[in-house]
């Protein structure tokens, strides 16, 4: 299965119990910031934005004072799982990032999708990739 298939079928899929609702954007990146696959609406990001995210996984709390930036948008960092999941909020939407052994799995959402729905979609794929040694 290609990485694009994981994005299209497992991240950008219709949400269970919510016909017509799905994440607004998603991607799978290598921990070096290389794009493995992304949805068409995933924001153009800067290398330093990914560096900040990877630093926060290694040093939890790094992004809290400045916020998480992706594609020029600033997200307020909210409770995540140190070293495993970063969650951010921006207005009526937000972001969930799950770290696996080799990748970063991104999901972005806007209302009516809830933070919990985004977390479930992103973390389920991230957990699967971890189980596969990826």
Swiss-Prot record:
Pfam families per record: Profilin
Post-translational modification: Phosphorylated by MAP kinases.
GO cellular component terms listed in the entry, alphabetical order: cell cortex; cytoskeleton
Spans traversing the lipid bilayer: none
Record-annotated disulphide pairs: 13-118
PROSITE patterns for this protein: PROFILIN
Entry keywords, A to Z: Actin-binding, Allergen, Cytoplasm, Cytoskeleton, Disulfide bond, Phosphoprotein
Extent of motif Involved in PIP2 interaction: 84-100
Phosphothreonine modifications at: 114
Subcellular localization: Cytoplasm, Cytoskeleton
GO molecular function, one term: actin monomer binding
PANTHER family recorded: PROFILIN, PROFILIN-5
Function according to Swiss-Prot or TrEMBL: Binds to actin and affects the structure of the cytoskeleton. At high concentrations, profilin prevents the polymerization of actin, whereas it enhances it at low concentrations.
Family: Belongs to the profilin family.
Other remarks in the entry: The variability of the residues taking part of IgE-binding epitopes might be responsible of the difference in cross-reactivity among olive pollen cultivars, and between distantly related pollen species, leading to a variable range of allergy reactions among atopic patients.
Subunit structure comment from the entry: Occurs in many kinds of cells as a complex with monomeric actin in a 1:1 ratio.
Record's protein name: Profilin-2
